[in-house]
A protein has these predicted regions:
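Solvent-exposed loop/turn segments connecting transmembrane beta-strands
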Residues: 216, 249-258, 449
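C-terminal beta-signal and adjacent terminal beta-strands/loops
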Residues: 387, 471-472, 522-538, 565-623
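C-terminal beta-barrel architecture of Gram-negative outer-membrane proteins
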Residues: 297, 459-567, 582
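Short loop/turn motifs that connect adjacent beta-strands in outer-membrane beta-barrel proteins
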Residues: 50-57, 164-177, 231-240, 271, ...
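Transmembrane beta-strands of outer-membrane beta-barrel proteins
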Residues: 57-59, 177-183, 238-244, 260, ...
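Hydrophobic, lipid-facing positions within transmembrane beta-strands of outer-membrane proteins
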Residues: 41-45, 63, 153-159, 220-228, ...
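Transmembrane beta-strands of outer-membrane beta-barrel pores
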Residues: 61-67, 163, 183-191, 230, ...
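Surface-exposed, low-complexity loop segments enriched in small/polar and acidic residues
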Residues: 1-220, 279-355, 380-446, 479-494, ...
Length: 623
C-alpha cells in the first residue's frame, strides 16, 4: 500500500525504483545555543568657536567600531553525520588472515575509519532505543564560530552665520537669515568572518551556509541649511518662519544623491506651535546588501506546487499554473512538501543596487499651555512614500505571481531541481537577492504627551507617553499588486506591524537628591496573520500555503520595566533596571507564517521580548 501511493509496483518482477527521505531531529544532543557578544567603541574629537560676532565654526572627527563574536553550540555536523551513518562491519585482515584491529574486528565501524579518511568517526544509529552515547555526541556536534567588525570614520566641518547683523532680514521680523554650510567625509566598512563549517553550511540546524562579507564605501558631502523669520511679534503670529536644507553626496559606489527639505513653522500664541515640512531623503544600500556573498539557504515558507504526497494531499495550484513555475507534467502532484515549511532561496548581496528614495510630508502641532505648567503635548501626522525600495523580492510572492501571471521576470527566479523540489537539494531554489523593487507607502500619527508636577515633600512625578498610530503600510512590489500590512504579520507582510503601540513612563524624582525611579509600560496591539486579511492576494496565498486560524492572531502584549538611577557629584550616574519585570513570554506562531530570517524561533524578536526578563546595569561618567 505504501509503495502504490507513490506509483511503485510491489510485484516480484518489478523494476520500479523510488526515493524515500527520512528526517530526524536531534533531540538527544540538547538544544542549540548561541553565545553572542557585541562590543562597541566610539571616539569623537572636535572643536568649535567664534570667528566673529556673526560667524562661528564647528569641526569634529569621529571613529566608531562595533565587534561581534558569536559561538553556536550543539549543532550536528552534516559532514560528520553522513560519515557516522555510513557504516560497515570491520573485516580487515592482514596477509596472514589476522584482524588488523582486534578491538574493532567484527564490529560496526565507520567506512571512513576503515579506509582511514577519518579515524575519529564514531558510528551513529539514529534508531537506537537507548538514545545516543556520549562519544557519538562528542563526534557529531561541532561549534560554529562567527566574527565580525563594522567601522565608521567621519570628518565634518561647518560654519554657521547669523546675517541679522548685516541687515539681511525682513521688515516684519527682528531675526534675520541664519545660514549653515559645510563638508563631510564618511567611510563605512564591514567585515563578517564565519569559520569554515559555517561557510560550508555544515551545521545541521543553520539552514545553509553563512557567507562572509567584506566591503565598504566612502562618500564626500557638501551641505547647506537656511532659516529665516517671516513674521515676529504680530497678532496671531508670535513667529512665522521658514527653513530649507540641501545635501549633495558623492559615493565611491559610482552614484550621487541629492536630498533636501522645506519647512514652515508658525507660533500664533506662546502656547501653540504648528509646523509643516516636506523632505526628500535617500537610503543607500548597506555593506551586507551590496557585498553579501550569494548562496543557497533557507528563505521561503511555501511551495504551492508541493503537497504531502504520503497523505494523498493535492496541490493548491492547477497543472498550468505549476508548469509556469517549472513543474513538469509527470511531477505534478508528486512533489513532496517540506514538513517544516522551509524552502531554499538563493540569497545575498547585489553590487548593482541603487539608493532608495523617500518623500515625507508631515504636519505637527505642539501645545504647552501656560495655564497648566508641566504639561506638553505634541502630535505629528506623517505620510511617507518610498520608491526603488531595497528589499528581497520575497520568494513566496515570486512563486505565486509567477503561477498566476506567467511574468517572465518572476518565473526566471524559480529554479527547481531534477525532482521538481525547492528544498530537497541545493539545486532547487528561488532567487531572492536584494533588489530595487516596487514602492512602500505608510501613513500614521505620532503622539508625545508629558506632564510633570510636584507631589509635595515626596518629590516630583513625571508622566510621559510616546505612541504611534499606524494607519497604513502599503507595499506595491509590482504594478497592479498592492497590499496593506498595517495590523498584520506573516509570510508576506513579515514583521508584525501593530496599528497601535506605545511606551508610558512614570518617573519619580525622589526628595533624595540624585535618586530617580522609573516604571515603564510598553504595549503592542494585536496583529492578524496576513492570510486572514480581506486582500485577495494575501488571503489566497495564506489558504494555498496551509495557514489556518490556529495562529490567526497574535494577541496584544504588555511589558513592565523598572529602572533606578543614582547621580553622585553631578558627574557619576549609576543606572540599574529590569526589563520585562514579570517575565512575559513572546507570542508564538506556526512555521507557515514564520519566514526564515525575520521570524526567529517561531516569534518576532524585533517587536517582542524573546528572551524574557533582563537585568542590566550602566555607569555614566561626565567629564
Amino acid at each position: 500500500m505504501f509503495c502504490e501511493q507513490f506509483g511503485l509496483s510491489t510485484a516480484a518482477d518489478s523494476t520500479d525504483r523510488g526515493q524515500i527521505r527520512i528526517g530526524k531531529r536531534n533531540v538527544e544532543g540538547g538544544p542549540r545555543q548561541s553565545d553572542i557578544t557585541h562590543e562597541a567603541y566610539r571616539v569623537v574629537v572636535g572643536m568649535r568657536g567664534d570667528i566673529n560676532d556673526a560667524w562661528s565654526y564647528d569641526a569634529y572627527g569621529q571613529y566608531g567600531t562595533s565587534n561581534l563574536s558569536a559561538v553556536a553550540t550543539n549543532d550536528f555536523s552534516i559532514e560528520r553525520t553522513a560519515r557516522a551513518l555510513n557504516v560497515q562491519i570491520d573485516d580487515r585482515v592482514d596477509d596472514d588472515g589476522n584482524p588488523l584491529n582486534p578491538t574493532t574486528f567484527g564490529t560496526p565501524q565507520c567506512v571512513s575509519v576503515v579506509d582511514g579518511t577519518d579515524p575519529a568517526c564514531v558510528p551513529y544509529n539514529p534508531f537506537a532505543l537507548n538514545g545516543i552515547a556520549a562519544d557519538q555526541i562528542g563526534y557529531l556536534q561541532i561549534p560554529l564560530v562567527l566574527k565580525g567588525e563594522t567601522t565608521e570614520r567621519i570628518v565634518n566641518a561647518s560654519v554657521t552665520g547669523d546675517l541679522t547683523n548685516y541687515g539681511i532680514k525682513l521688515p516684519s521680523a527682528s531675526t534675520g537669515l541664519m545660514l549653515n554650510f559645510g563638508v563631510e567625509y564618511r567611510e563605512e566598512l564591514s567585515e563578517l568572518l564565519p569559520d569554515g563549517p559555517s561557510q560550508a553550511g555544515d551545521g545541521a540546524g543553520t539552514g545553509g551556509p553563512t557567507t562572509p562579507v567584506n566591503g565598504g564605501y566612502r562618500t564626500n558631502d557638501i551641505f547647506a541649511a537656511a532659516r529665516m523669520a517671516l513674521l515676529e511679534d504680530k497678532p496671531f503670529a508670535q513667529s512665522l518662519s521658514w527653513e530649507a536644507g540641501y545635501r549633495y553626496s558623492d559615493y565611491s559606489l559610482d552614484f550621487t544623491t541629492d536630498t533636501y527639505k522645506l519647512g514652515l513653522e508658525w507660533t500664533p500664541i506662546e502656547d501653540i506651535r504648528a509646523r509643516a515640512s516636506y523632505q526628500r531623503s535617500v537610503r543607500v544600500p548597506n555593506v551586507t546588501e551590496l557585498f553579501g556573498v550569494q548562496a543557497v539557504g533557507l528563505d521561503g515558507t511555501i511551495d504551492l506546487c508541493a503537497s504531502d504526497v504520503s497523505d494523498g494531499e493535492t496541490v493548491a495550484l492547477t497543472p498550468e499554473e505549476c508548469a509556469r513555475t517549472g513543474v513538469l507534467p509527470e511531477q505534478y502532484n508528486n512533489i513532496q512538501s517540506n514538513p517544516a515549511a522551509q524552502y531554499n532561496g538563493f540569497v545575498g548581496g547585489n553590487p548593482d543596487l541603487q539608493p532608495e528614495t523617500a518623500d515625507t510630508l508631515s504636519f505637527g502641532l505642539a501645545f504647552q499651555p501656560s495655564f497648566a505648567p508641566g504639561l506638553r503635548l505634541q502630535i505629528d501626522y506623517f505620510d511617507i512614500s518610498i520608491d526603488d525600495a531595497i528589499q528581497n523580492p520575497n520568494a513566496d510572492f515570486s512563486l505565486l505571481l509567477c503561477a498566476q501571471t506567467g511574468d517572465p521576470l518572476l518565473c526566471s527566479r524559480i529554479q527547481r531541481d531534477g525532482d521538481g523540489s525547492l528544498w530537497q537539494s541545493n539545486d532547487g531554489f528561488i532567487v531572492d537577492t536584494f533588489q530595487n523593487i516596487g514602492e512602500i507607502a505608510t501613513k500614521g500619527i505620532d503622539l508625545d504627551v508629558s506632564y510633570a508636577f510636584d507631589i509635595g515633600a515626596a518629590g516630583r512625578l513625571g508622566l510621559d507617553l510616546v505612541a504611534t498610530r499606524l494607519e497604513s503600510l502599503e507595499f506595491t512590489p509590482q504594478p497592479g499588486v498592492t497590499y496593506d500590512c498595517a495590523g498584520l504579520y506573516g509570510s508576506i507582510c513579515g514583521v508584525p506591524a501593530p496599528e497601535w503601540r506605545h511606551k508610558m513612563d512614570a518617573t519619580w524624582r525622589t526628595p533624595w537628591s540624585g535618586i530617580d525611579l522609573t516604571l515603564s509600560w510598553r504595549y503592542f496591539d494585536a496583529v492578524k496573520q496576513d492570510s486572514q486579511d480581506a486582500n485577495e492576494f494575501l488571503s489566497f496565498l495564506g489558504t494555498a500555503s496551509g495557514q489556518d486560524a490556529t495562529d490567526a492572531e497574535l494577541g496584544s502584549r504588555s511589558y513592565i520595566d523598572l529602572t533606578g538611577s543614582v547621580t553622585l557629584a553631578d558627574k557619576y550616574t549609576l543606572r540599574v533596571g529590569v526589563n520585562n519585570l514579570f517575565d512575559k513570554d513572546p507570542p508564538l506562531n506556526g512555521a507557515n507564517a514564520c519566514p526564515s530570517g525575520p521570524c526567529n524561533g517561531n516569534t518576532w524578536p524585533q517587536v517582542y521580548d524573546a528572551i524574557g526578563r533582563q537585568i542590566f546595569g550602566l555607569v555614566t561618567i561626565d567629564f
